[in-house]
């Protein structure tokens, strides 16, 4: 009985693991898209005002540099120190996916 319960519990956890992981797209929509745009182009009112980079075309930065800017901010971009390392990693991966 214990083995069956353990196996079932393990299967539930494994199948729902993605729900507990960081979701780069959701984080982007919540925290980044208002300036950087849904597609990373920066073609938003605030993005134009702040002259943000078009991440759908150019990404000349390392993952470590991107993570540092997300966590600590840079220039007019505010810091997101409250994000976990997993959240930051998911955001960096999502930014990479925006390049056309």
Feature map (PLM): residue ranges:
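N-terminal export/targeting leaders of redox proteins
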Residues: 1-22, 100
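Periplasmic/extracellular electron-transfer cofactor-ligation site
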Residues: 25-51, 75-78, 97-100
